[in-house]
Structure formats: structure tokens, C-alpha cells
UniProtKB/Swiss-Prot annotation:
Organism of derivation: Pseudomonas putida (Arthrobacter siderocapsulatus)
GO term, biological process aspect, one: protein refolding
Top class in the EC scheme: isomerase
EC number: 5.6.1.7
Complex and partners: Forms a cylinder of 14 subunits composed of two heptameric rings stacked back-to-back. Interacts with the co-chaperonin GroES.
Localization of this protein: Cytoplasm
Pfam families: Cpn60_TCP1 (PF00118)
Gene from which this protein is expressed: groEL
Name of the featured protein: Chaperonin GroEL
Keywords: ATP-binding, Chaperone, Cytoplasm, Isomerase, Nucleotide-binding
Gene Ontology terms for molecular function: ATP binding; ATP-dependent protein folding chaperone; isomerase activity; unfolded protein binding
Domain of life: Bacteria
Length: 545
């Protein structure tokens, strides 16, 4: 086992504090409408330019092991805030830096670290409760656009496109962000249910100009196994009774596919085949989703129905189906609203229960396909570097707007935290050390407002005092240098983002204050480099001149 280096007390905390400040100083430069950019070098390719706090935090790794521990703990604050609300990473980092700096001063002055932490926790709980009281529901498109704009570093085009996407697909809908090919952001909305499987043969195409297969008023045959014999293919065609038919199966191959293609080309029956989406159990669940949406039934031997015994009653109906090389879209399925609602309810319950982020994401996609729709935002930019930076901002703004819809909005620009101070003005702890912890958090919650002001080139103390003297939504617009009603000026933050940032900062900050020892691998003494190897036998080379 490698030797360890151990540090105790103040010497450990001082080292940790250096790391905290290095990371936080790099991250906090990006805060607010006048935040600066940070350039990140890459091991290959062009450097990346970003104003995203978590992207900056992820890049930082320090040489000194003890300083690095401090930096990594603050990185954890940014990640926690990002996981909880998808945004607010810079605010969380600024809050954590303030809590740790003030807390370690108090510990050095002889305060009890455990009581300080209890005071911080008590004050945090009171501020969080007050933030919930301050929050207003975010229902209309205008408020959603404002939240998106603020989160995307005051880019109104991003806020507006997200609001438009949410309006089109609803709160449950899936909105994905992709790299576009033009200079402008584009929004495309998919009607009905779309899944990422295309036609199994180009011979199904009946619109050569767009290379898609389009079926009007088709029946849908859903099968949870492979179809490989021509007899099975004939059974499927017989079941459709001459109407256009879409076959969704685990696979259609060999003779069966050849039979379907020939019959389609001869005009005997209008047919197209596609692989079922997903794999394993997820494939079965998605087939069932399609069945519910179209009012059909999955042909499965598990429930005693085979292809040979399938009848018209087992088939689903839709107004139209469009198959491209990559995707299949089912428009206006004929499923009963009550059954779709029951299925949606079931998926929501599974989302609540699952602990896997991957499963949750897949379940949310399924939910959106049944309940809402799918919108794709294609990000446009002049260069690849700008594209990556812009895409990260769009993703941030999307998370922020979802959080706003979930828990409402509060005045932005650090004002909500300052207003929430009212909850801890008269708060008292069980002893004097706890009171110091409460006072410490009281100062810390002003730090985002002060940092936004400093980044805008104004005097933080003057602005903080003026905002504290005001009430309600009165605050400071760093973009214009004006004071006024933050909500009217369109400066909103999602309550969930502000709450998550404070909770993550107080949690990690409190743990760092109570640190008494730090253990890291001792630096290894590298052996000195040797000289040149012996060149014996080459002495006669001089005579070659």
C-alpha cells in the first residue's frame, strides 16, 4: 500500500481553502449577464469557450493533492445543483465559497465547527421555506421565455424558441437539442408518436421524391417475435383484409420480407414493415405503448395469440403512418383516451419508483410520446466552437424552464435570496456558536448578488445595501445598470434552481467546515535520471573524419 500524507487542523483547512478559492474564482467569473468567458484547452482540437459554470468546474484539477480535495468538493456542489435542477451551478459555487471562507474564519477564531454547521443548516431550512413562499407559478409562454433567456446568458432567441417548443408539445413533451447545419436556431415538431426505426426495405417507399413510405388510414400489426416465413407473411396480409398495413415486429427477414416486398410492388396489398423500437423488456413495453395508442393488441404467444389466429380485432388503427430511412411516425392513433390516460399514469408511477437515471430518461421519452409530442431544437452557429458553447447554453436554458414550470419562479439577479433573508433576521440558535453559523449564512446569501454586480463592473456593497433597503421584487438589473421590479424587467429565476443551489452549497460547505484531518497519497520520490549509456567500442569513430 502506498504511503499516505496526513494533515490536521488549520494546516489541512488552509490547503483545502486554497483549492476551493481557485475553482470558485474561475467559475464565478461567468456569473450574471455581464459574466466573462472562460477558455478551456483540449488535448486535441480547438479550445472551447464557455460561460457554463459546471463545464469550467469539470476541467479543474490541481497539482497539490490537498488543494485538489478542496477543489473537488466544490466541484461536487456544482454537480449536485446541476443534477437537481440542471442549472444554478455558478450560484451554488459562489454560495459554497462564501460559506467555506466565512466558516473557516470562525473555526480559526475558536468556534465549535459542529455548532456552526447546525446554525448553517437551521438558517438554510428557513431560507428554503421562504423561497417557496416567494415563488409564483410559471404558466404563460412569456414567463417561460424570460426564464430561458436569463439562463442562456441573456440570449432572447434561445428563450423564445424554448417557449415556442413547450407551447407546441406541452409540459410533458420531450424537447431535444441537436447541432443544426445553418446559422439560425430552428425548431421542428413531430406530430404523433415517433420512434427511431425506419423501413426494412427501400422497396416499401411510395414517395420517391422524399424517399418515404406513407400509408393512409392503415391497420397496424404488432408482433413481439421475428416473422421469417412466407406463410407467416401471407397470414399478416390476410388479416388486413385489403387495407394498407404496417407491420411492427422484432424483425421481418428472408422469405417473409421478400413476399411482402413483391406483393407491395404488384399492388396486391399496400404494406410496409419496420423493426420494433427498443430492446428486451423495453421493446415489449414500447410495443404495448403503440398498441394502446392505436387501439390494437400485441400478437404474442404469451397471451395465446399467434399470427395464424390474428384477426381484424387484434390490429390497431391510425390516420396516417410515415416511414423514412431512420424514423417511423404514427399520426392520430385510434386508441381510447381512457386507456391512453391509464398507460400514462402507469409510466408516471414507474418514473417515481426508478432509481436509475437512464431508465428515468427512457420512461420520460415514452411518456412524452404518449402524452405530448417531440420537439427538436437545432442550434445554428457560425463555427464549431460557437456551436458547442451555444448548445450547452440551450441545454441549460431548457433545464431552467422545466424547473420553472415545476416549482414556479422568483425574482432573479440574486434578489430572491436577499428577500429570503427576512426569514432569518430574528432566527436564534441554541447557543452563540449556532448564532454565528446563522449570521454566516446571512452574509453568504448576498454573495450571488454581489458577484453579479462585481462582474458588471459596479460596486457590490452599494448595490447590495440599496437592494436590501427595497422590498418585494425590487432589485438591480446588471445588464442595464438600473434598479426596478425584476419580474417586470423579465429577470426571473426558477425557484427550484435557487433552492437546489443553496441546499447543495450549505451541505458541502458545512461538511468542509467540520473537516479536521485530510489524507492523501504521499508524493513519490522519482529516481534521478541516469546519464548516457556506455559508448564502448565506438572510440575509433574519430578516425572517420
Amino acid at each position: 500500500m502506498a504511503a499516505k500524507d496526513v494533515k490536521f487542523g488549520d494546516s489541512a483547512r488552509k490547503k483545502m481553502l486554497v483549492g476551493v478559492n481557485v475553482l470558485a474564482d474561475a467559475v464565478k467569473a461567468t456569473l450574471g449577464p455581464k459574466g466573462r468567458n472562460v477558455v478551456l484547452a483540449k488535448s486535441f482540437g480547438a479550445p472551447t469557450i464557455t460561460k457554463d459554470g459546471v463545464s469550467v468546474a469539470k476541467e479543474i484539477e490541481l497539482k497539490d493533492a490537498f488543494e485538489n480535495m478542496g477543489a473537488q468538493l466544490v466541484k461536487e456542489v456544482a454537480s449536485k445543483a446541476n443534477d437537481a435542477a440542471g442549472d444554478g451551478t455558478t450560484t451554488a459555487t459562489v454560495l459554497a465559497q462564501s460559506i467555506v471562507n466565512e466558516g473557516l474564519k470562525a473555526v480559526a477564531a475558536g468556534m465549535n465547527p459542529m455548532d456552526l454547521k447546525r446554525g448553517i443548516d437551521k438558517a438554510t431550512a428557513a431560507v428554503v421555506a421562504e423561497l417557496k413562499n416567494l415563488s409564483k407559478p410559471c404558466a404563460d409562454s412569456k414567463a417561460i421565455a424570460q426564464v430561458g433567456t436569463i439562463s442562456a446568458n441573456s440570449d432572447s432567441s434561445i428563450g423564445e424558441i424554448i417557449a415556442e417548443a413547450m407551447e407546441k408539445v406541452g409540459k410533458e413533451g420531450v424537447i431535444t437539442v441537436e447541432e443544426g447545419s445553418g446559422l439560425e436556431n430552428e425548431l421542428s415538431v413531430v406530430e404523433g408518436m415517433q420512434f427511431d426505426r425506419g423501413y426494412l426495405s427501400p422497396y416499401f417507399v411510395n414517395k420517391p421524391d422524399t424517399m418515404v413510405a406513407e400509408l393512409e388510414g392503415p391497420l397496424l400489426l404488432l408482433v413481439d417475435k421475428k416473422i421469417s416465413t412466407s406463410r407467416a407473411a401471407a397470414s399478416t396480409e390476410r388479416a388486413s383484409a385489403g387495407r394498407p398495413l404496417l407491420i411492427v415486429a422484432e424483425d421481418v427477414e428472408g422469405e417473409a420480407l421478400a413476399t411482402l416486398v413483391v406483393n407491395n410492388m404488384r399492388g396486391i396489398v399496400k404494406v410496409a414493415a419496420v423493426k420494433a423500437p427498443g430492446f428486451g423488456d423495453r421493446r415489449k413495453a414500447m410495443l404495448q405503448d403503440i398498441a394502446v395508442l392505436t387501439g390494437g393488441q400485441v400478437i404474442s404467444e404469451e397471451i395465446g395469440v399467434s399470427l395464424e389466429t390474428a384477426t381484424l380485432e387484434h390490429l390497431g388503427n391510425a390516420k396516417r403512418v410515415i416511414l423514412s430511412k431512420e424514423n417511423t411516425t404514427i399520426i392520430d392513433g385510434a386508441g381510447a383516451d381512457t386507456e391512453i390516460e391509464a398507460r400514462v399514469k402507469q409510466i408516471r408511477a414507474q418514473i417515481e419508483e426508478t432509481s436509475s437515471d437512464y431508465d428515468r430518461e427512457k420512461l420520460q421519452e415514452r411518456l412524452a410520446k404518449l402524452a405530448g409530442g417531440v420537439a427538436v431544437i437545432k442550434v445554428g452557429a457560425g463555427t464549431e466552437v460557437e456551436m458547442k458553447e451555444k448548445k450547452a447554453r440551450v441545454e441549460d436554458a431548457l433545464h431552467a424552464t422545466r424547473a420553472a414550470v415545476e416549482e414556479g419562479v422568483v425574482p432573479g439577479g440574486g434578489v430572491a435570496l436577499v428577500r429570503a433573508l427576512n426569514a432569518i433576521v430574528d432566527l436564534k440558535g441554541d447557543n452563540e456558536d449556532q448564532n454565528v453559523g446563522i449570521a454566516l449564512l446571512r452574509r453568504a446569501v448576498e454573495s450571488p448578488l454581489r458577484q453579479i454586480t462585481a462582474n458588471a463592473g459596479d460596486e457590490p456593497s452599494v448595490v447590495a445595501n440599496k437592494v436590501k433597503q427595497g422590498s418585494g421584487n425590487f432589485g438591480y438589473n446588471a445588464a442595464t445598470g438600473e434598479y426596478g421590479d425584476m419580474i417586470e424587467m423579465g429577470i426571473l429565476d426558477p425557484a427550484k434552481v435557487t433552492r437546489s443551489a443553496l441546499q447543495a452549497a450549505a451541505s458541502i460547505g458545512g461538511l468542509m467546515i467540520t473537516t479536521e484531518a485530510m489524507i492523501a497519497d504521499a508524493p513519490s520520490d522519482a529516481p534521478a535520471g541516469g546519464g548516457m549509456p556506455d559508448m564502448g567500442g565506438m572510440g575509433g569513430m574519430g578516425g572517420m573524419m
